[in-house]
Amino acid sequence: MNSQIKTKAVYWGTGRRKTSVARVRLIPGNGLITINGRSGDDYLNFNPLHLNSVKAPLQTLGLENSYDILVNVFGGGLTGQADAIKQGAARALCELSPDNRKPLKTEGHLSRDPRAKERRKYGLKKARKAPQFSKR
């Protein structure tokens, strides 16, 4: 019997960081990044730190010019959104091929960063800042 490998045209991945959530689609292309309908450079204010973060999973596998990244992201600021996109792209690459999982995991692209804003407690001015202490 002839077994055929099914190949999809679109690979999905969801990433989260702080309060940001990114839905990432990988489409065979030439490395264009589109975030919320704008170019990746424009959306991330041409910040090389954020741009490199978004491209990191593809660069780890050497696929930066093989797939276009289409992103719908909301919540948080640019840093949180860039890291959410990174995680979403890494998850989409795992969907592309199970062999991609190991190198992405060793680079840390698949792990969710649990750091988030600590809540404010009553009796304090901020999460940990206490009012000035007076002995007398």
From Swiss-Prot:
Output the Gene Ontology cellular-component terms: cytosolic small ribosomal subunit
Record keywords: Ribonucleoprotein, Ribosomal protein
Q: Name one GO molecular function term.
A: structural constituent of ribosome
Q: One biological-process term from Gene Ontology?
A: translation
* SUPFAM superfamilies, alphabetized: Ribosomal protein S5 domain 2-like
Feature: compositional bias, Basic residues: 117-136
Q: Looking at the record, which segments are called Disordered?
A: 97-136
Q: Where is the composition biased (Basic and acidic residues)?
A: 98-116
Ranges in a coiled coil: none
Is Ribonucleoprotein tagged as a keyword?
A: yes
Q: Record's Pfam families?
A: Ribosomal_S9
Q: Which Gene3D superfamilies is this protein grouped with?
A: 3.30.230.10
UniProt record similarity statement: Belongs to the universal ribosomal protein uS9 family.
Query: NCBIfam families, per this entry?
Result: PRK00132.1 (NF001099)
This protein's name: Small ribosomal subunit protein uS9
Origin species: Prochlorococcus marinus (strain MIT 9215)
